Amino acid sequence: MKIINFTIPEKIGKSIHIKEDKLPYFYPHLHRHVEIQITWVLSGEGTIVIGNNMKPFQPGDLFVIGANQPHLFKSNPCYFEPDSRKKIHALNIFFNPEGFISQLLRFPEMYNIKKFIKSSNYGIQASEKDAPKLFEHFLKVINNEEGFMMAYFIEMLQTMANLTEWKYFSTESFEYLFTDIEGLKMNDILRYTMDHYKEEI
């Protein structure tokens, strides 16, 4: 098993991609993609793996996952039971930092946003205090079209860049691509850890 290179479906004429997940459980494989991912968990519990760290997630959490950063939302075991009626619900915004926004980042006024995008390589989570502020911006982005969507998207990034209480996941920035061998090793470690996390080491 290796890290799956996931391709986010692109819509012609769209610079950012909005995706709503309503499923029995989250996508159960460690994967990565070239887009930065902003995820708002509306319902569902489990363990999130970003880079070289993991922690529980719950409804109300908001994460920013860097481009090409291996990650996994692992739903709790009860979601996989045959008679389970549990569902997950999440809203996602994807954008390629090497795409349209790379042109905008050349402007000096975009310095803080550029710095924030760089920090996403560590995998970050909004604090409980700041998350509600971001939800309002999130909804503006996904509920608008064309120019208004882009304006609200930049506004959201600026708001994120101004926050100071982000929780960092990784101790190292994941700016490089893993080889298949490295991905295999990481999957083995994660699989063992998550299968035996209740046991004493």
Indicate where each model-derived feature is located.
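Conserved long hydrophobic alpha-helices within structured protein cores
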Residues: 56-74, 153-160
